[in-house]
C-alpha cells in the first residue's frame, strides 16, 4: 500500500546528506617476529555516529521553502532524509593457551528519524540474523521485537528496526593446521522506536525487551590465516521471540 510509510520509503527516491564520525581502538599487538609471545587478553572497541539532513533543513527554514504534498521539504525535487544514528561494539578475547580461547562480543545501536523524516531510510536501519548477528536466523529474518512476518516475499522490508542489541560468547579450539573448531551462543534482536501498524510487536519497551531477545547456539569451523579468518557456522534457534511461534 502506498499509504504504508515503511513500504513507500523503502522504494522511493530520497536524498541523504550526512556527516559521520567513526572510532576504532584495540590493544591487540601487531604480529611481528618480535612479538611472538602469546597475548593473553585483548579487546577491540568500534563506535560510529552520523547525522543527516540538518544543514538542508536549516536552509529550507531560512529561505522559507514550502512543503510539498507529503508534508516534507525537498531538494532537486527529491525528499531528503533527516536522522541521527549511533552504534558501538565491544569485543574481548581471552587466550587460555596457544590452542584455546574464549571470545565475547556485545553491540548496540539506535537510529532516530526527526524533522523532515518519519522513518529512517531503509538502508540505514538495523537488521538481525546472519553471520554477524544471531546465527540461528538468516539475514533479515529476525524481529523487530516479537513481530512475525506473514509475507515471505516482502518480509525483508518489515524486518528492520531502529534499535539493535546483540551479544555472543564463543569458545575456540585449534584442531590442526589452520583449522579451528568453535562452539557459540548468540543473543539479540532489533526493535522500532515507534509503534508502526505494519510491524506489530516491534516497538521497544523496557518491560518487555528482555523477553524478546532471540537466543541461538551452534558450532562452526574456522580457517585462521592470522591476517584474515574464514568462517563456517551452523546455528540453531533456542528461543524464538516471534508471536504465534513456540518460543523454546
Locate the predicted segments by residue.
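C-terminal transmembrane beta-barrel domains of outer membrane proteins
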Residues: 1, 8, 16-18, 38-248
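Acidic, glycine-rich catalytic/binding loops that coordinate metals and/or anionic ligands
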Residues: 12
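Intrinsically disordered, low-complexity linker/loop segments enriched in Gly/Pro
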Residues: 26-28
